[in-house]
Structures are given as C-alpha cells and as structure tokens.
C-alpha cells in the first residue's frame, strides 16, 4: 500500500513511519531525509536547499517534486512505501497524482500545545538519524542515542523562531490538503496525541481495512 502521512511538524509522522517501515517492510521516504542527504553531499540542489531551510522557508515545489519522484523511481517495490513530508500543498498533491495512483492519506491530528512541546523537545542522532524526545521519548542516557550511542542534537528549525514560521507555512499551505483528499474519500484521521503504541495501533487498524 502507498501511504502519505499528513500533519503539522512534530505530530509524530517521522517516528511512526520509521517504526512501521521496520515492522511492515514499508520503505520510508522522508523529504526531510532526502533534503539533508543532498545537503550533506553538497550537491547543487543541496546547496540551494540548505540556504532555504536555514532561512526557515519551505523548499520550492519544483525541487521537492523532482527529488521525490526520482527517489520513488529507484525503489524495487513501488507498491509499499510511506511518503513523509510530501505533498505539502495542493500543487504537490496534484503532481503526485500524475505519477502515483491508489494512495491512502493518513492525517495526524494533534493539539497545538502538545505540538509545541514535542517540537521543542525533539532530539535527533547525528550518527543514525534516530528521533527521540526529552518529554515523550527520552533516551536512557541524556544526550546519547539508544540505538547507536551517537550524540543527539536539536535541529535549528526546532527552535522557537523557526517553529513559528514553519507552523504559519503549514496552516497556509498544508491544511487545505485535508479538504482536497476528503473530497475523494482518501483521508484517514488519527489521534496523534496518544502515545506511540496507541498511534501505531490506530494506523495498523486503518491499513488492515485496505
């Protein structure tokens, strides 16, 4: 099944995608990971993306669509994957429909107060990319990854000033996707304020219907 995860930054999309990709053998495609890989490799697109992200802005549709479509085309199994962070707006959603069919949308619903707490507490492993949270998913040892013992860091766009910009962009561009996908009965809502096990259980129940 082809899944798209929708929801504001910090709603747990990435964490749940990583968990289910292991349990259900789905490939997890994160636009954030794709962007960071290009930045790390200092590709021409990566240099452009780096400056855009550091300014707290969203990467242009033309770049995002190309990176995602190219990645999907490299997959051996194009029927079982999770898209995390794409599409972000109607233009991207329409572009996605031109090269993918039979997509189910998972919409993560979360109270904004909980959202801010999650975002400010998020920590990421510098070595393996593992995602933790000092409030909701703390590591056994402070600042150290449970998976590989790498050091944890806080992303620049998880600090308050960048958070405000990201949430504004979400409300302006991403939320209309809910209406877009509701019209053709592809939208499945999940209460993302539950703990990780609860969200995972809800998602598996949805997947089992299709």
Curated annotation (Swiss-Prot):
Pathway given in the UniProt record: Purine metabolism; AMP biosynthesis via salvage pathway; AMP from ADP: step 1/1
Stretch list, region LID: 121-158
CDD domains: ADK
Positions of the UniProt region annotated as NMP: 30-59
Sorted UniProt keywords: ATP-binding, Cytoplasm, Kinase, Metal-binding, Nucleotide biosynthesis, Nucleotide-binding, Transferase, Zinc
GO molecular function (one): ATP binding
Binding site for AMP: 31, 36, 57-59, 85-88, 92, 155, 166
Reactions listed under catalytic activity: AMP + ATP = 2 ADP
Enzyme Commission number(s) from the entry: 2.7.4.3
Location in the cell: Cytoplasm
Binding sites annotated in the UniProt record for Zn(2+): 125, 128, 145, 148
GO CC, one annotated term: cytoplasm
Superkingdom, taxonomy of origin: Bacteria
InterPro entries recorded: Adenyl_kin_sub, Adenylat/UMP-CMP_kin, Adenylat_kinase_CS, Adenylate_kinase_lid-dom, P-loop_NTPase
HAMAP family in alphabetical order: Adenylate_kinase_Adk
Family as reported in the entry's similarity comment: Belongs to the adenylate kinase family.
PANTHER family: NUCLEOTIDE KINASE
Domain notes for this protein: Consists of three domains, a large central CORE domain and two small peripheral domains, NMPbind and LID, which undergo movements during catalysis. The LID domain closes over the site of phosphoryl transfer upon ATP binding. Assembling and dissambling the active center during each catalytic cycle provides an effective means to prevent ATP hydrolysis. Some bacteria have evolved a zinc-coordinating structure that stabilizes the LID domain.
Function: Catalyzes the reversible transfer of the terminal phosphate group between ATP and AMP. Plays an important role in cellular energy homeostasis and in adenine nucleotide metabolism.
Subunit structure and binding partners: Monomer.
Protein's UniProt name: Adenylate kinase
Species, as recorded: Borrelia turicatae (strain 91E135)
Gene this protein is translated from: adk
């Amino acid at each position: 099944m082809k899944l798209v995860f929708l929801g504001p930054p910090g709603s747990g999309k990435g964490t749940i995608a990583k968990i289910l990709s292991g349990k259900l053998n789905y490939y997890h495609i994160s636009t954030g990971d794709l962007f960071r890989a290009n930045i790390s490799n200092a590709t021409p697109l990566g240099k452009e993306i780096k400056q855009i992200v550091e300014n707290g802005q969203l990467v242009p549709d033309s770049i995002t669509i190309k990176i995602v479509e190219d990645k999907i085309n490299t997959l051996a199994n194009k029927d079982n994957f999770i898209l995390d962070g794409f599409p972000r707006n109607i233009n991207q959603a329409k572009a996605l429909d031109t090269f993918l069919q039979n997509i189910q949308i998972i919409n993560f619903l979360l109270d904004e107060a909980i959202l801010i707490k999650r975002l400010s507490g998020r920590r990421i492993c510098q070595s393996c990319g593992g995602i933790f949270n000092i409030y909701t998913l703390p590591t056994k040892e402070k600042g150290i990854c449970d998976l590989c013992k790498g050091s944890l860091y806080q992303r620049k766009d998880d600090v308050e000033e960048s958070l405000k910009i990201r949430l504004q962009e979400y409300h302006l561009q991403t939320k209309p996707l809910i209406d877009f996908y509701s019209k053709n009965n592809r939208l499945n809502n999940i209460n993302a304020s539950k703990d990780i096990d609860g969200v995972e259980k809800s998602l598996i129940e949805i997947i089992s219907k299709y």
